[in-house]
Amino acid sequence: MPPRQTSKDDQPELPLSVASADAASGVAAPAAPAAGGGAHPPAPPDSPAATEGAPGPGPEAPLARSYREWFLEYASYVILDRAVPHIDDGLKPVQRRILHTFWEQDDGRFHKVANIVGACMRFHPHGDASIGAALVGMGQRGFLVEPQGNFGNVLTGDEAAAPRYIEARLTAFAREVVFNPKTTTWQLSYDGRAKEPVTLPAKFPLVLLDGAEGIAVGLSTRILPHNFNDLCRAAINHLQGKRFRIFPDFPTAGIADFSEYNDGERGGKVKVRAKIEVRSKYQLAITELPFGRTTEALIESILAANAKGKIKVKHVDDNTSEAVEILVHLPQGADTDQVI
């Protein structure tokens, strides 16, 4: 549901000026008696007599000062060093630190994820849970990190096993295109005890390959993933000075409408639907998912629509493993086209 748009009529009326309690009640405040018992008319507001002895602006409130001095620093940190990928290598800081940790310990063999998380804590000033979650996400895509063990399932939404039970290592692709110590700019880690890369000299547009999503302070990003071969062809055309167009490609597949894509710029839209096949007179099969949806969430929406009477469904089977297969069984007399 889109956010509710507010109008001027929805906003409470605020006073343009603040009057004293006496003025608000219609009672005039008594004038201070002058020396000698007489009364003098009030001095003009801008006269020395009116401003003499008036209180100054006073010290700034601690909360206001803290907000003014620290909030911009905090917002800049979240934008630049946490939630948004860097344009040079397409990586968020936690992803860059994970890859650097893998590079330091790389011997061609698998490493326990818990060990990588612990070693990465030397560079990452936040909790170990964020490192583990980012590493699992990179392993699920499989371009930079090769997983071994239960890394969960992006199709069903099943979670990965604990870091002590799963292993990972750098892929050959990552070793080839991501690292080059001779051309890397280094900086001290957050505690000054180690050196980490400012950015990695990636030879491939990683931010378009895996996509990215993050919410910072006053800024958010959502970059959709793209097909590896499409990116290679686009890079070659770009180097040769040829024009090209490229569209997102989703790991969950689906049927996409790019008519309002706007080349990925602000305001563009992509509509993705599940792919549904008619297996028999009273059976439908869902074989592809919209991006960002899981089989569990999709089945829940089907059952909710059935409960509300929008569609008629007998029962639903989820046979998804490496590929999506949701079987929707319809009751006698149901129309498959109407259900779709």
Regions found by a protein language model. Name each.
Residues 249, 266-340:
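Charged, surface-exposed alpha-helical interface/stalk elements
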Residues 2-267, 326-329:
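Catalytic phosphate-handling regions of large nucleic-acid enzymes and associated NTPases
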